[in-house]
């Protein structure tokens, strides 16, 4: 199993290109199943999750051709994907594939919308909280689907097709909004999604669907309206830049000091996180090529943050911020409101010498003068990269184990950091 070895203490200087957003690329790939024509997606990140979803879609008969593959890239896909779902041969998504990634459960929406039936295993993925699929099932039932759970599978049928309806989520759900959006695109009549998620990735998927002929308005607001159409056609769409990757590298620069240009980043996608970094004493400069992040000489100031749905501070940057605050001059407080059980990185950060106390949903981080390298183990995608951030500033050597989590969500992380002066290498085997 691969590991990453880091020798801390180097400031970061240079340019890091920001990849396409994983959290947009995955639903966009799934949305391609709504049409029998080809969807071309540009700026798709080369990630393990993208490769896994390609296998899952291939199981249904979807043909995906990767263009721009680099020499030696056997696992990851190219930056441009040509996706053709002309012939869907199977409406069952098996456990052995779906159990590896929760987002793959979303195939239930295009299968129901286009084929009027689906049998999809209950999902897997990062072990963060329970993340029940109840809200997704509720949304599909509102659209007229008949659903039951049989031996670990959700069995869904809509013999007469899906019908437009009002779907009001009791709480904001990104997964539920994605599923409702895709299913309603081909439903008969008008669908209203109330209390919809406002994340930029939702807007990106809606923009792509509109290019394919859907009639969607209000994406990016809590109220989305979809007028169903009978057919969607092919299109070409560029995946928006990854705001979580942007924030992650910004915090890495803040942690080590130095100055890095985040090329292709869009500040409006993570303004809340940039505001928090500014409060912490980091210099953020927006320019034509993205965002420049710098911390030269000044210490890190403590902050108090509560995670929230967009446009609030993203839960997917909570672990990275916690790593940064381990070096702050004073006590910081981070409250997690989106997912339960999302403090699994605390125990591993403590191995560096971090001082963190948990009280329910709130972590109090007392900054320390030094972190020391240690062997650590990644527990999930975002927690794993928080360990990398800590290691970059720690004295001595850190070995990060179980880095397959990193490969799920960060494209060429060690290459990007190494190019900016970090001493970091992947050790295979």
Swiss-Prot record:
GO terms for cellular component: cytoplasm. The modification 2-(S-cysteinyl)pyruvic acid O-phosphothioketal is found at residue 126. It comes from the Bacteria. This is UDP-N-acetylglucosamine 1-carboxyvinyltransferase. InterPro entries: Enolpyruvate_Tfrase_dom, Enolpyruvate_Tfrase_sf, MurA_subfamily, RNA3'P_cycl/enolpyr_Trfase_a/b, UDP_GlcNAc_COvinyl_MurA. Pfam families: EPSP_synthase (PF00275). The active site is at residue 126. It catalyses: phosphoenolpyruvate + UDP-N-acetyl-alpha-D-glucosamine = UDP-N-acetyl-3-O-(1-carboxyvinyl)-alpha-D-glucosamine + phosphate. Phosphoenolpyruvate binds at residues 22-23. SUPFAM superfamilies: EPT/RTPC-like. Pathway: Cell wall biogenesis; peptidoglycan biosynthesis. Its main location: cytoplasm. GO terms for biological process: cell division; cell wall organization; peptidoglycan biosynthetic process; regulation of cell shape; UDP-N-acetylgalactosamine biosynthetic process. The lineage of its organism: Bacteria, Pseudomonadati, Pseudomonadota, Alphaproteobacteria, Hyphomicrobiales. Gene3D superfamilies: Enolpyruvate transferase domain. Keywords: Cell cycle, Cell division, Cell shape, Cell wall biogenesis/degradation, Cytoplasm, Peptidoglycan synthesis, Pyruvate, Transferase. The gene is murA. The keyword Metal-binding does not apply. Its EC number is 2.5.1.7. It comes from Rhodopseudomonas palustris (strain BisB5). CDD domains: UdpNAET (cd01555). It is found in: Cytoplasm. The keyword Cytoplasm applies. UDP-N-acetyl-alpha-D-glucosamine binds at residues 102, 131-135, 316, 338. Cell wall formation. Adds enolpyruvyl to UDP-N-acetylglucosamine.
């Amino acid at each position: 199993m691969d590991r990453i070895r880091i020798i801390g203490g180097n400031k970061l200087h240079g340019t890091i290109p920001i990849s396409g957003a994983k959290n947009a690329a995955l639903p966009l790939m799934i949305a391609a199943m709504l049409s029998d024509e080809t969807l071309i997606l540009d700026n798709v990140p080369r990630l393990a999750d993208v490769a896994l979803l390609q296998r899952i879609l291939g199981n249904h008969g979807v043909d995906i051709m990767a263009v721009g593959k680099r020499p030696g890239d056997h696992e990851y896909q190219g930056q441009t994907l040509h996706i053709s779902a002309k012939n869907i041969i199977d409406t069952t998504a098996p456990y052995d594939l779906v159990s590896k990634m929760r987002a793959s459960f979303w195939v239930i929406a295009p299968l129901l919308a286009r084929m009027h039936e689906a049998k999809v295993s209950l999902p897997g993925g990062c072990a963060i909280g329970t993340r029940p699929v109840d809200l997704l099932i509720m949304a599909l039932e509102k659209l007229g689907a008949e659903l039951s759970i049989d031996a670990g599978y959700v069995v869904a049928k809509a013999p007469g097709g899906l019908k437009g309806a009002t779907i009001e989520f009791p709480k904001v759900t990104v997964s539920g909004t994605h599923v409702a959006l895709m299913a309603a695109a081909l439903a008969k009549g008008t669908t209203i999604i109330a209390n919809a998620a406002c994340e930029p990735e939702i807007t990106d998927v809606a923009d792509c669907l509109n290019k394919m002929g859907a009639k969607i308005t209000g994406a990016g607001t809590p109220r989305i309206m979809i007028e169903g159409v009978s057919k969607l056609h092919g299109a070409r769409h560029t995946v928006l830049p990854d705001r979580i990757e942007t924030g992650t590298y910004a915090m890495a620069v803040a942690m080590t000091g130095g100055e890095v240009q985040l090329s292709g980043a869009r500040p409006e996608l993570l303004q809340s996180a940039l505001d928090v970094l500014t409060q912490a004493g980091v210099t953020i400069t927006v320019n034509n090529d993205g965002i420049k992040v710098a911390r030269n000489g000044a210490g890190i100031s403590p902050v108090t943050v509560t995670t929230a749905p967009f446009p609030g501070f993203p839960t997917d940057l909570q672990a990275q911020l916690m790593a940064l605050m381990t070096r702050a001059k004073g006590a910081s407080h981070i409250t997690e409101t989106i997912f339960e059980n999302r403090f699994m990185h605390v125990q591993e950060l403590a191995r560096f010498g971090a001082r963190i106390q948990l009280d329910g949903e709130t972590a109090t981080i007392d900054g320390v003068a030094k972190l020391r390298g240690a062997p650590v183990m990644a527990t999930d995608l975002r927690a794993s990269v928080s360990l990398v951030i800590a290691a970059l500033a720690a004295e001595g050597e850190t070995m990060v184990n179980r880095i397959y989590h990193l490969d799920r969500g960060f494209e060429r992380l060690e290459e990007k950091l190494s190019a900016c002066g970090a001493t970091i290498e992947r050790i295979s085997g």
